[in-house]
Amino acid sequence: MKIRVVVLIILAIIIADQGLKIWVKTSMYYGEQINLIGNWFRLFFIENEGMAWGWKFGGEWGKLILTIFRLIAVIFGVFYIRSIVSKNYHRGFIICVCMIFAGALGNLIDSMFYGLIFSRSDDGLPLATMFPPGGGYAGFLHGKVVDMIWMPIIENKTLPTWIPFWGGERFTFFSPIFNIADASISVGVIVILLFQRRFFKKKPHEEHATIETNSQVNDTVQVL
């Protein structure tokens, strides 16, 4: 796979992710919902300070550590992608790594810059604006990640009483609210796990080289 194809894949994901985030941030009130397909596929504007899928991580210091970790991971990802492209890894594996990288970069952009360029979004506040006169709602590396995709396929249903521990309680499936970057990371990881044998299968010339090497070793042992 050529580098320019890799760059196009990454750019496409980041543009889609950031475009939707900016639209939601500036066009929807915090907590507002828009039904896209029935009641099970919605836009639901929230922000989170933590990891993917709304998981939180240790307050302000945790937020800073998480953002720095993301930055290091993205820098490492640049070199790793160059390496697997130059070594001609399986096309599917390269695409999955690009998806994971683009997702990490998409959320990193939020964490690094959104606090600087947007006004605060919260319950009862007006729509957020870009580059507000008084400055953004947070400093560098302390921005909140914008989430908006919610797919409650089963919402607020009561579990049968015979189910241990949770019987009789109400639940929603699928409850996390996420964004395109989160989805890109998750799909990339899942596809790698499902198709790892295909992605890392030895090529015919590598298998032939292994057979020849083993044969040479056996001949040497017999001579000795």
Please give the residue ranges for each predicted region.
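Alpha-helical transmembrane bundles and membrane-interface segments of multipass inner-membrane proteins
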Residues: 1-224
